[in-house]
Amino acid sequence: MKKNRVFATAGLVLLAAGVLAACSSSKSSDSSAPKAYGYVYTADPETLDYLISSKNSTTVVTSNGIDGLFTNDNYGNLAPAVAEDWEVSKDGLTYTYKIRKGVKWFTSDGEEYAEVTAKDFVNGLKHAADKKSEAMYLAENSVKGLADYLSGTSTDFSTVGVKAVDDYTLQYTLNQPEPFWNSKLTYSIFWPLNEEFETSKGSDFAKPTDPTSLLYNGPFLLKGLTAKSSVEFVKNEQYWDKENVHLDTINLAYYDGSDQESLERNFTSGAYSYARLYPTSSNYSKVAEEYKDNIYYTQSGSGIAGLGVNIDRQSYNYTSKTTDSEKVATKKALLNKDFRQALNFALDRSAYSAQINGKDGAALAVRNLFVKPDFVSAGEKTFGDLVAAQLPAYGDEWKGVNLADGQDGLFNADKAKAEFAKAKKALEADGVQFPIHLDVPVDQASKNYISRIQSFKQSVETVLGVENVVVDIQQMTSDEFLNITYYAANASSEDWDVSGGVSWGPDYQDPSTYLDILKTTSSETTKTYLGFDNPNSPSVVQVGLKEYDKLVDEAARETSDLNVRYEKYAAAQAWLTDSSLFIPAMASSGAAPVLSRIVPFTGASAQTGSKGSDVYFKYLKSQDKVVTKEEYEKAREKWLKEKAESNEKAQKELASHVK
């Protein structure tokens, strides 16, 4: 996550946002290079069960220990992992994978346990289905027969379209062609599971602080995990591809965001290999002087961070509201599209981003769409171009809006005031009294998160006026914050009006990986983003989300022409943008000032899945000297050229897999 892509990249992960090297290959080899890597992690996992958890806190710990069928190479192409080769039928419905012989399962102590076989992948998906995986949306409507198994229509998993033809041949049968299918397979719900080991562990399987509760077939072995303290890995010396593992040890220290300066201090002392910097921190001017030739900005990631709107709030344990009428007024306001649009246009995204990136780097992280605007393209037009062409149909306020990354195309005080005036007239006619009070929760330990929400407060109150809207910041402990946002058990526990603790990273290379999560039936994510888990809630109907469902479903049915498919998904994104139910703000990772001792562009690169993120350490190379900005820029220029050539070659080779 996810990546994650997962809504697990919510609030706190932004604290450590920064792509470790944005990742590509370095031709150099230095046997004397440092073999240890140190940095931070920001949330303890609730479980190590990678098949059921879609949270980044689990991905951080498990992605380095478990290999699936594919990984990503240094240029973002899918690369063979446990799958040595693959083919797809001409109708696009049957995918067959040749399992690499000699890939083994190991205990956390490095003892060989068993060989990885095709059956382990069948076991993995069955386990995910039986345990109601948070990531089941990736497979449920794709794998033939899986939806019937999940609904109970069928109780025989052998009717599901995943088969171990023999020990070294795995086959998936799909409901409809999915050109992006293989890109899903780097995500953990499709990883293997040794059934014998799982059974032997019983209820102790995948315990969150017990490395012995898992088996490992990946580049690293988990050696230790102490809650709110540390995560430790060592190289798997018997890993099938150990030549591409250049680190011997990885040590991640827990970081709650309360001491931003600690990242640079530990980098300078040598404890950390990398440091995300915060230009608004008290020591930044000193750091900038000391490292003036070394600070560079990473590339913007594919994940999105923004603000969710709770359309069905039920709990008020953390609130500044003193009367029921204030609660009713806020709910009515948030159900009003013009009011939500006023908030959307009132957010100064550059100021919001500047709270962690500083003024110089603020624009680099700004994002105006839920789907990254250049995530896919239809001919010469990016996805953002397709959306921009359709938005004006919803109103003149969308004419000429620039949706590209790296600039704030939505902040417009005049538009915000105009939309608010329409909302106020309608709400007053409905008996609503002003100002509207908006409760926004923050983790009191996270300085940069608090500063972003304070920026949101300032933008909204300045543009709309405190006589109209008041943003009430609710400070609480880290655990309290997580329990009413990220880890909330259900929608009734989502105790907020607007939440900045929401973000998403794509899981596979198709717009649906973003847009599906806000369908009314995606309760695991709609509760976190929009405060509801009942698809038939009156609030859901009132804001028109059933129309959004129709648009997304119509796009999903288009499988023969990708350009038409992307046009239809752009229609769904246009509806979502106009609805302002989710207020986009910035990329959830990257576009950040950093210091690094990682060789630039060494590591797996990908916009999707769990094998190209900033938490996957295969391929990474460390060096003694701090990377200079000049070195980074030269490496980036070289990498971009090589990447374009490599991606084109990989695209042409796809045809050879159609049988």
Swiss-Prot record:
Family in the record: Belongs to the bacterial solute-binding protein 5 family.
GO biological process, one term: protein transport
Protein topology in the membrane: Lipid-anchor
Coiled-coil segments: none
InterPro entries: Peptide/Ni-bd, SBP_5, SBP_5_CS, SBP_5_dom
Lipid-acceptor residues (N-palmitoyl cysteine): 23
Keywords per UniProt: Cell membrane, Lipoprotein, Membrane, Palmitate, Peptide transport, Protein transport, Signal, Transport
Lipid attachment residues per UniProt (S-diacylglycerol cysteine): 23
KW Protein transport (keyword) present: yes
Keyword Membrane assigned: yes
GO molecular function terms attached to this record: peptide transmembrane transporter activity
Organism: Streptococcus pneumoniae serotype 4 (strain ATCC BAA-334 / TIGR4)
Primary location group: membrane
Protein name listed in UniProt: Oligopeptide-binding protein AmiA
Signal peptide: 1-22
A single Gene Ontology CC term: periplasmic space
Subcellular location: Cell membrane
